[in-house]
């Protein structure tokens, strides 16, 4: 399971948030784990953002000052071809891919940067536009 709209920015490039071997783990535990990982870089209790999780399907969650709820799928596909690295030394920030209906308010920790990128790619009748 991976986040498709939130990434770490590092000295070597962009890094995915991925949790492996998730077959026997419930989704709420995994979402809490992603939020726990993010809490190292942002103030969860002061921030509002969306987590888009991809396993076999895409699921949307909203984290509002630490309170997590599932929200309706808006058919954004998050399919931009992005480059990722596996090896890095230093995390410099967190990147959020947002849409017109997914506003965010992020309070960073320890001088980490917050980067936001906007997408509008939606799934329409079998096509990614």
Swiss-Prot record:
One of its GO terms (cellular component) is virion component. InterPro entries: Virion_core (IPR009201). It holds the Pfam family Chordopox_E11. It comes from the Viruses. It is found in: Virion. Keywords: Virion. The keyword Ion transport does not apply. Induction: Expressed in the intermediate phase of the viral replicative cycle. Belongs to the orthopoxvirus OPG073 family. This is Core protein OPG073. It comes from Variola virus (isolate Human/India/Ind3/1967).
């Amino acid at each position: 399971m991976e986040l498709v709209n939130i990434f770490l920015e590092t000295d070597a490039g962009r890094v995915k948030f991925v949790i492996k071997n998730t077959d026997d783990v419930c989704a709420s535990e995994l979402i809490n784990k992603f939020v726990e990982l993010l809490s190292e870089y942002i103030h969860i209790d002061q921030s509002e953002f969306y987590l888009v999780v991809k396993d076999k399907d895409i699921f949307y969650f909203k984290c509002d000052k630490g309170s997590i709820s599932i929200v309706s799928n808006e058919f954004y596909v998050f399919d931009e071809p992005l480059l990722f690295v596996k090896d890095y030394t230093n995390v410099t920030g967190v990147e959020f891919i947002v849409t017109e209906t997914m506003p965010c308010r992020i309070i960073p920790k320890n001088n980490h940067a917050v980067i936001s990128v906007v997408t509008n790619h939606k799934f329409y009748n079998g096509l990614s536009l």
